[in-house]
């Protein structure tokens, strides 16, 4: 093997080792954001739901501050149920990483029939939450709250 080939091989190995230490990004959350935009016809940016109340965003605890926050609590619980399914219990198959097939037609969301059991469950979690977000009032006072004192 030529020295140049060894250098290329070494560079590839180092790159792969570095990539292995980078946590994977939740691919499904991108789809969930698109579902939210479909259901609310783009009236409110998805980022407004990332840090709302006690449950919208990472984690969640306490009592939901309003109906919109309750939508997020139900969504969190739905993802928790998905994680218990045997079909969702293998590497990178859980609700945060497993992508699914769906359609958006004029604000109507449909999970496609070609989803396996896990994908169908996750898709329905996201669909239900997106519809809930679209029909529930948004209270600006509940965005970016102090969760330590209010939740």
From Swiss-Prot:
This chain's source organism reads: Tropidechis carinatus (Australian rough-scaled snake)
| Active-site residue list | 75, 126
Reaction catalysed? a 1,2-diacyl-sn-glycero-3-phosphocholine + H2O = a 1-acyl-sn-glycero-3-phosphocholine + a fatty acid + H(+)
This chain belongs to which protein, by name? Acidic phospholipase A2 3
Q: Does the keyword Lipid metabolism apply?
A: yes
Where does the secretion signal sit in this chain?
1-27
Similarity field = Belongs to the phospholipase A2 family. Group I subfamily. D49 sub-subfamily.
CDD domains from the entry?
A: PLA2c
What does the record say about how the cofactor binds? Binds 1 Ca(2+) ion.
A molecular function annotated in GO for this UniProt entry is: toxin activity
Q: Which Pfam families does the entry mention?
A: Phospholip_A2_1
One GO location term (cellular component)? extracellular region
């Amino acid at each position: 093997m030529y020295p140049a080939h060894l250098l290329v091989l070494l560079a590839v190995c180092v790159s792969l080792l570095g990539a292995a230490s980078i946590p994977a990004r939740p691919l499904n959350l991108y789809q969930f954001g698109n579902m939210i935009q479909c259901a609310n016809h783009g009236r409110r940016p998805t980022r407004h739901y990332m840090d709302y109340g006690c449950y919208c965003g990472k984690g969640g605890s306490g009592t939901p501050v309003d109906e919109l926050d309750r939508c997020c609590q139900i969504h969190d619980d739905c993802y928790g149920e998905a994680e218990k399914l045997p079909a969702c219990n293998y590497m990178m198959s859980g609700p945060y990483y497993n992508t699914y097939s769906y359609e958006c037609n004029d604000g109507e969301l449909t999970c496609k029939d070609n989803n396996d059991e896990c994908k169908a469950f996750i898709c329905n979690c996201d669909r239900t939450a997106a519809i809930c977000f679209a029909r529930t009032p948004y209270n600006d006072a509940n965005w970016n709250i102090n969760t330590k004192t209010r939740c």
